[in-house]
Amino acid sequence: MKFVDEVTIDVTAGNGGAGCASFRREKFIPFGGPDGGNGGHGGNIFVVGDRNLNTLIDFRYIRRYTARNGEAGRGSDQFGAAGEDIVLRVPVGTIITDTETGEKIAELLVHDEKILLAKGGDGGFGNLHYKTSTNRAPRQKTPGWPGEVKNLKLELRVLADVGLLGMPNAGKSTLIAAISNARPKIADYPFTTLHPNLGVVRVGPSQSFVVADIPGLIEGASEGAGLGHRFLRHLQRTRVLLHMIDMAPFDDNVDPVAQAKAIVKELKKYDPALYEKPRWLVLNKLDMVPVEQRAALVKDFVKRMRWKGPVFEISALTREGCQGLIHAIYSHVASLQEQPEEVPDPRFTTNEDLSEAAPAPDRDDPRFR
């Protein structure tokens, strides 16, 4: 299935039905009074988050959604039926924005969360509504109110705990296939990954985290080069980024340090907030480096990179070092999920000794007997 993570749609809620002006007409009842009912409410348009969806492709082919209008009121005190609502199902993690105002209408982060996108118009009043003790035969009625019309932008950002970052062919897809049940396409040419892939990593029976793999970045990605710039937004909800480095490039003229610095530069250009996220270095393909040269190669890389954060040495192909990386990631993610201790509100705290401010009651006082 084709991956689509951004679409624009038009939604039109239903108009309210018109009110009715009529009078009761029966034999032997010359002045039956008003009996015109109100119009029905126009149909609303809702959006619901669905964890079973992972693309917005359905909205690529159907871009206009119009709810039914409410029915008009009728005589004999009959109110019009409300228009049928429309419910749009989108992947969890979708952000919906009004293109005209720029206002963020909804951000669906929970399965089955339901949010109103466009409100249907209220039904008009029939003449029965205007009946009073002084106006017993009203003839006025009102039309229904129009429903809301909006042009909306739907943007999908995947929900993942960990994001994989790196140049093409750094081994990101190989890693996600090694540590999870995800099976992305893997090949020895650049840009094999064309869309984000998600994988669930099981650490224990009830312990897991989600990893997101996006297409590789190249220098100039923030200006539109390559594919990665289109998918960097999918890393904005992650808790930690794994910067994967190819330590054994095919071309001897390629400098892994220069490539790593280029990725960091592009990340900072694209989104400073994404640049500030916790980022770990994962030195991959060490199985292709002679054992006696590994320590010196890693030490030289870290020194030239001037890196102060965590460093992991792995081989995604042979899975060497992957278990240590998995447990480190889970410990980090679990620590962030713990709720912080409640901090008492300083407005309701005092440093005074309450034992002195409120002396103990006198036991001889008859009120306490």
UniProtKB/Swiss-Prot annotation:
- Which stretches of sequence are listed as region Disordered? 339-369
Residue sites binding GTP per the record: 166-173, 191-195, 213-216, 284-287, 315-317
Does the keyword Nucleotide-binding belong to this entry? Answer: yes
The top EC class is: hydrolase
Q: Which Pfam families match?
A: GTP1_OBG, MMR_HSR1
Q: Which gene encodes it?
A: obg
- InterPro entries for this protein: G_OBG (IPR031167), GTP-bd (IPR006073), GTP-bd_Obg/CgtA (IPR014100), GTP1-OBG_CS (IPR006074), GTP1_OBG_dom (IPR006169), GTP1_OBG_dom_sf (IPR036726), OBG_GTPase (IPR045086), P-loop_NTPase (IPR027417)
Task: Give compartment(s).
Answer: Cytoplasm
- Give the source species: Leptothrix cholodnii (strain ATCC 51168 / LMG 8142 / SP-6) (Leptothrix discophora (strain SP-6))
Q: What's the protein called, per UniProt?
A: GTPase Obg
Its required cofactor(s), as named, are: Mg(2+)
- A GO MF label: GTPase activity
